[in-house]
Regions:
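Alpha-helical metal-binding/catalytic segments enriched in His/Glu/Asp
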Residues: 53-54
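Extended beta-strand/beta-hairpin segments
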Residues: 1-48, 59-96
Length: 96
């Protein structure tokens, strides 16, 4: 069974649904790529997924080794490049 079901809503927007929970996320193309920039862009979600995965893995390791792991966050900077348009760099800074 699929994990995520995504549908195109038109106007460069999509809706991704986590099938098991029913939680939904809307994406919108950014202003600099013909969108309205009213929601996460697909590449924003990619970088958010990376940082969420990193913090989750750190949390699992901390729990496994009885290390306090609270009030931890990170800032993510996504740097786009052209020709072809793509994510060129992702910078993750942890606040611990």
């Amino acid at each position: 069974m699929e994990t995520i079901r995504t549908k195109y809503l038109g106007g460069l927007r999509t809706e991704a649904e986590h099938v098991k929970s029913g939680q939904k996320v809307i994406t919108d193309a950014p202003l600099d790529n013909q969108g309205k920039g009213e929601a996460f862009s697909p590449s924003d979600l990619m970088t958010a997924s990376l940082s969420s995965c990193m913090l989750t893995i750190m949390g699992i390791a901390a729990r496994t080794h009885d290390i306090p792991f609270e009030n931890i966050s990170c800032k993510v900077t996504k740097i786009m490049v052209a020709n072809p348009r793509r994510v060129g760099e992702i910078v993750v800074e942890f606040d611990m």
